[in-house]
Amino acid sequence: MDIIFYHPTFDTQWWIEALHKAIPQTRVRAWKSGDNESADYALVWHPPVEMLAGRDLKAVFALGAGVDSILSKLQAHPEMLKPSVPLFRLEDTGMGEQMQEYAVSQVLHWFRRFDDYRIQQNSSHWQPLPEYHREDFTIGILGAGVLGSKVAQSLQTWRFPLRCWSRTRKSWPGVQSFAGREELSAFLSQCRVLINLLPNTPETVGIINQQLLEKLPDGAYLLNLARGVHVVEDDLLAALDSGKVKGAMLDVFNREPLPPESPLWQHPRVTITPHVAAITRPAEAVDYISRTIAQVEKGERVCGQVDRARGY
């Protein structure tokens, strides 16, 4: 069995050695331009078109939870990957736990009004503030996939009212489910905190815009953990300046790295992290990939395959 590997920033040698240990009798090589030798599987992140074009692969694994970079290249270069080749993404591999940590810590930060106290501290102002109450602090999750379900589970521990919105209705215990565009307004109407975990598809690009933000309760908060293209940044800034949105925690942006001149950097109600909410944990990813390859080799049904038409 032959595996080709490409990632612009990962420690390639570590991955090659780890894959050798996890899948004995396998030959793993780092792909370089001009390498046209046969392979059975490809492990990739932002792969060049020439790496995959024309190959008879058993499967391709995206080394992250998102596959938008591959699918966007496929639109421009359909020859990049044959329709018969399954495309898999890393459904969890430690990302769910990281998303839980990130979301819970920020929700509690807002719920306990630490953002307000930080602003008071900046002006040396000592003033206890009225507390928020859980029943008035409904949390809405945009996107009800694997990571969305993990975040919902962790927030249930803190007894917040929870709701989710997705393409199809979910039946998560303790979570009110909304589905389809016709129910989006009703979903938004009670969301004190809006957590975005949507996939990146043509239908979701720019979804968090002026029209959506206006449907939130006054003084709502936004936590974007999905993709920067979901948010119209100028509309968010306007909502922050007007007070419609009280605070935003942003991990992803339309342009990354976020340009130094972006007004988001200096906005007092915005907190920024550099796309670190959930990173690929190599050891857990290798374990998932090795198990999945074994299932493919046996002809078993495998979870995590991307529906190219839907985009996730």
UniProtKB/Swiss-Prot annotation:
Protein name: Glyoxylate/hydroxypyruvate reductase A
Predominant cellular place of this UniProt entry's protein: cytoplasm
Domain of life: Bacteria
Keywords recorded for this protein, A-Z: Cytoplasm, NAD, NADP, Oxidoreductase
Keyword NAD: yes
Enzyme Commission numbers on file: 1.1.1.79, 1.1.1.81
Keyword Disulfide bond recorded: no
Catalysed reaction, written as an equation: glycolate + NADP(+) = glyoxylate + NADPH + H(+); (R)-glycerate + NAD(+) = 3-hydroxypyruvate + NADH + H(+); (R)-glycerate + NADP(+) = 3-hydroxypyruvate + NADPH + H(+)
GO cellular component terms, A-Z: cytosol
